[in-house]
Amino acid sequence: MNQEEVGRYNQMRARYRATVVQRGLREDTAWGQPYDALNVQAWASPPLKDHVGLLQEELKQLLPADTRYVPVDRLHISVACLLEGRSGGRPENASRWEKIGAECLESLRDVCARARPARIRFERVLSTDVAVLLVGRDGGELDVLRRCIGDLMTGCGLEYRPKEIIHCTVARGGPTPGNGAELLHWADERYIDVEEFVGGVDVLWEWTYPSLATTTEARLELAGPLPRPDRPS
């Protein structure tokens, strides 16, 4: 990670460490409720799936029984958030998106057609109060894509909240009183080194709870020669 990325990661880690260690409770009010969002995501490749599968087996010894693990065949990398999720119903601005969604999606295809493929290196595991994430970095290609997406959405009159980090969700579940420090220590000790090649992204409605299932709304191909993993059936 470069200096800026390390600083961003450490800020997030410190923020969640305070919550986990001092309170040991889930802060997200959406926990256990239906929760949907519209995101830009890339599907994970077999090597990344293998690493996540091993991490999930370890986490089963640390996290509560109600933890929800992302099915390995649906493992994805979160690149940008188009509509922030909202518990118990549709995301805010969903109706606005529906009115101009077709036009906006077509523009997104144009943006992605000009984007370069990206190499993402996953090195860190981040434990938050509600999820366990793999944190990735790229050479700047996805940052350029995210800025273009933001400019496009703003121009369409839609709010855009860029994700703080490029990440892959391993599990949705948080610590309980008594195991928060252990979980943080586990995450700190996990150093991985997986390089991921992203040659295409999807725009997905993501129904996060309870099934973690996703439904494809539109597929956006990045330009360039890098191979893209086969998409789950």
Question: What residue spans do the PLM features occupy?
Answer:
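Histidine-dependent nucleotide/RNA phosphoesterase domain, centered on the 2H-phosphoesterase fold
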Residues: 1-233
